[in-house]
Curated annotation (Swiss-Prot):
One GO BP: regulation of RNA stability
UniProt cross-references to NCBIfam families, sorted A to Z: Hfq, PRK00395.1
Coiled-coil region(s): none
This protein's name: RNA-binding protein Hfq
Amino acid sequence: MAKGQSLQDPFLNALRRERVPVSVYLVNGIKLQGTIESFDQFVVLLRNTVSQMVYKHAISTVVPARNVRVGPGGGYVHSGSDTLQINDDEVE
């Protein structure tokens, strides 16, 4: 697994599993909202009234509507915060 995906996959999987509503901001500024149905290495399937396949290279930011527990040892991803806390390590 690539080092860049060691946080990405558990984060997206937690959002998918818990059906957390998300706002997805694209690099062109467009905001999409819905829940993550599925994802792979290249795309995220976002569901609202319809399903949209969004290419990851077009995504700037994914903002969950509520806090999400990530991984078995699990810290939380705090929505609306500039600090991401995972497994007691802080990344700003």
